[in-house]
A protein has these predicted regions:
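Cytoplasmic helix-loop-helix junction between adjacent transmembrane helices
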Residues: 1-21
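Helix-loop-helix hairpin linking two adjacent transmembrane segments in secondary transporters
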Residues: 16-64
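Interfacial helix-cap and linker-helix signal at transmembrane-aqueous boundaries
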Residues: 30-38, 121-122, 154-155, 159, ...
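A membrane-interface helix-boundary motif in multi-pass transporters
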Residues: 36-48, 165-168, 248-266
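Juxtamembrane intracellular "pre-TM" segments in multi-pass secondary transporters
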Residues: 65-100, 124
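Extracytoplasmic gate region of multi-pass secondary transporters
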Residues: 94-149, 208, 212
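Cytoplasmic membrane-interface "Motif A"-like loop-to-helix N-cap segments
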Residues: 156-173
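A late C-terminal transmembrane helix in Major Facilitator Superfamily
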Residues: 216-253
């Protein structure tokens, strides 16, 4: 997607992101429904099979953008980046490193939410599994759908004025979501929790919309795929710990406290993103344009 869009890159990626949100809403209900009828193992079998089919289709149908002959020849002459170079680029570029750390914080909170929120609604409000799966996914991803489209447009406009404002927007998005995380973890009124879901989804979209645009602004084009892989791998490796951590907190202090605790992660990450935008972004942005 980034190869096909330059000035509207953030908006293009935001449109792509909406497909993810639609899929989450549908799967949240479908997984609960399948689990309710045939047990939770069946849900894994169904979604695993769909994932395999989807992967095969993507592998067959996705093609790289065709470059002009001169550009293609120059690219072919270059040696392919080694695996370690992707790590080196991310971990020696301050902006990319900060983004990777904060992306990990984003995924940690989202994974914790996706794993435990259906259980929270099921246990605290007496919903059935299908209802808990649907309500925990619908409101937050509906508003994330709207938010990511608005954020994509805003990001492209801000980026044309001052590139560092994209990273600052990511930080403000995380900070704005903090009160809503606390709200959805502490309220005893269902509609108030839904408001928390909505605000959580809408505000986090301002981080997601700029994620790869910011990364590609500070990483040389030949390392884009490697750097993306490093960031995603790191983020989901750390995010995978969230279900375990929240499960331990649930046993010790209750799930409400565990969900509220997630706000601290985004509070710290939001502040770090603002510092990165202020002190590192333009240095890294200008550096690759002189190489």
């Amino acid at each position: 997607i980034a190869d096909y869009h330059d000035r509207t890159r953030a908006f293009a990626m935001s449109i792509h992101q909406t497909a993810y949100y639609i899929g989450i809403i549908i799967s949240g209900y479908a997984a609960g429904y399948v689990g309710q009828l045939w047990g939770w193992r069946s849900a894994f079998y169904v979604f695993g099979a769909v994932g395999v089919v989807h992967g095969v289709i993507m592998a067959v149908r996705l093609k790289d953008k065709k470059e002009p002959a001169a550009v293609a020849a120059a690219s072919a002459a270059e040696s392919k980046p080694r695996l370690t170079e992707g790590f080196r680029m991310v971990f020696t570029t301050p902006t990319a490193l900060i983004l990777t750390v904060c992306f990990s914080g984003l995924i940690f909170v989202l994974t914790g939410y996706l794993t435990w929120m259906p259980t929270y609604l099921y246990e605290n409000f007496g919903m059935d599994l299908a209802g808990a799966g649907f309500h925990s996914m619908f409101y937050t991803h509906l508003f994330a759908f709207v938010g990511v489209l608005l954020a994509g447009r805003l990001s492209d406009k801000l980026g044309s004025l001052h590139p560092a404002w994209r990273m600052a927007m990511q930080g403000f998005g995380l900070l704005a979501a903090v009160p809503f995380i606390v709200l959805m973890g502490n309220s005893v009124t269902l509609w108030v929790i839904y408001v928390g879901f909505a605000g959580f989804g809408f505000d986090r979209a301002y981080f997601v919309a700029c994620n790869f645009t910011v990364l590609y602004d500070v990483i040389l084009p030949r390392y884009h795929s490697s750097a993306s892989g490093v960031m995603i791998m790191t983020g989901f490796a750390i995010g995978a710990l969230a279900p375990l951590v929240l499960g331990m907190v649930k046993q010790a202090a209750g799930l409400s406290f565990g969900i509220s605790m997630l706000a601290v992660v985004w509070l710290v990450c939001g502040a770090v993103m603002l510092l990165g935008a202020k002190y590192f972004y333009m240095k890294d942005y200008n550096k690759i344009r002189h190489e």
